[in-house]
């Protein structure tokens, strides 16, 4: 027979699912991050003489290698920063201007090798970003440079 007791309906709690669209595809972001890190590891620093912004003869092979690395890469979605740096000699204003001239010099050399200027952000740190802080000629020489940074857009 039938029992007098009615079965209580099972209460199922609905969970609200919220989908957040960040406008970015995670796989593409991860691949872009991986490529940015790889490129940054392959690009070499360009060094400069005291108070100069022209590419030295001994740095031309470095620029050639950097041009090959950048020219062979899919830079879509990436920004390439050319970071000009100086030693501590000279005023802050002078060194910021010199650092920018160094970054432009590297950009122009890469352009001459067929790497597009649209892919570059030029920045000067002047003397504010030293890799060496000793007060020696060899240390100062290390600070006269253009570094590369590759970052996702």
Model-derived regions, located:
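Periplasmic peptidoglycan-binding/tethering modules of Gram-negative envelope proteins
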Residues: 3-79, 153
